[in-house]
Design a protein with these regions (language model features):
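Arg/Lys-rich, positively charged N-terminal/basic patches that mediate binding to nucleic acids
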Residues: 1-36
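Short, hydrophobic secondary-structure boundary micro-motifs
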Residues: 34, 56-58, 98
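Short proline/glycine- and basic residue-enriched helix-capping loop/turn segments at helix->loop/beta transitions
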Residues: 46-50
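Basic/aromatic recognition patch in beta-strand/loop cores that engages polyanionic ligands
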Residues: 53-82
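Enriched for short, Lys/Arg-rich terminal
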Residues: 73-100
Length: 100
C-alpha cells in the first residue's frame, strides 16, 4: 500500500496572513507577482508537510514551533499527525514572539 501523502492546514491567522501577503504584493508589484509569491509559499507548505525537519526549531520563541523562510517571510508551523499546522506567516521585520 502506498504511503499516504502528508498535508498542511492553515490556522485562521495564517490564512489571514496569506491573504494579506497576496493583497500587498498585488498592490505593490501586480497580479503576476502576487500569484507567483503565494504559489511559492504554498509549495513550501507542501514541502514542509512532507519533510518538516527542513524547518528549524524555534523552541526559544514557542515550544514545538518550527520555522522556514520563503522570500521575506517566515513560515511558523507545528508538526502534527497529519503533516503540519501552519500557524503564522510573518514578514522578517515583524517581532515573531509578539505575534505568535
Amino acid at each position: 500500500m502506498p504511503k499516504k501523502r502528508a498535508e498542511y492546514r492553515l490556522a485562521p491567522a495564517a490564512a489571514r496572513d496569506l491573504e494579506g501577503i497576496w493583497l500587498y504584493t498585488l498592490e505593490e508589484w501586480g497580479i503576476e507577482q502576487a500569484h507567483r509569491y503565494t504559489d511559492e509559499l504554498t509549495a513550501a507548505f507542501d514541502q514542509l508537510a512532507n519533510n518538516p525537519q527542513l524547518g528549524t526549531s524555534c523552541d526559544y520563541i514557542r515550544k514545538g514551533y518550527r520555522r522556514s523562510r520563503v522570500g521575506r517571510h517566515a513560515i511558523y508551523f507545528r508538526i502534527t499527525d497529519y503533516g503540519i499546522a501552519v500557524i503564522r506567516l510573518l514578514h522578517d521585520r515583524m517581532d515573531a514572539p509578539r505575534h505568535l
